[in-house]
A protein has these predicted regions:
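Conserved active-site and SAM-binding loop architecture
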Residues: 1-137
Length: 137
């Protein structure tokens, strides 16, 4: 359904979302799995002098990762709880796009251990929540 404003023009901010079958996105050519992360970090180090590794927590589909990339960071790990967000992130970015629940201490410890195997991390960023998708913990 298309909504019109008071003067009869289409209001683009009131379009009704259409949900259809999901689309499978191919992973980025430089994407890796969580257990492959230290090897991916070593590969980036071999190709770039002094890379600035970053981690994007609560990444969503990758808006903050894009900004970090444009600021010359290499986002080696992005984490989000939503599968569709992670699939979109994995399609657009190299590194590891990891679907996980960061409210679980065990998960956070596993991530910390894996990052310790990667060497120096320059930045850990946490994206602001998208309120309609956030849940109360």
């Amino acid at each position: 359904m298309i909504h019109k404003n008071a003067v009869g023009k289409i209001d683009p901010h009131r379009l009704t979302p259409v949900r259809g079958p999901s689309t499978e996105l191919d992973p980025h050519i430089d994407s890796c799995e969580f257990d492959e992360l230290p090897g991916y970090a070593a590969k980036v180090r071999s190709l770039k002098k002094d890379p600035n590794f970053a981690v994007d927590l609560f990444s969503g589909a990758g808006g903050l990762s894009l900004g970090l990339h444009r600021a010359n960071f290499d986002v080696i790990l992005a984490c989000d709880i939503r599968n569709d967000s992670i699939m979109t992130h994995r399609h657009h970015f190299g590194g590891c796009s990891y679907e996980c629940d960061l409210s679980k201490r065990k998960v956070v410890n596993e991530i910390a251990d894996k990052l310790n195997e990667c060497g120096e991390i320059s930045l850990i960023a946490g994206g602001p929540p998208c309120q309609p998708f956030s849940r109360n913990i």
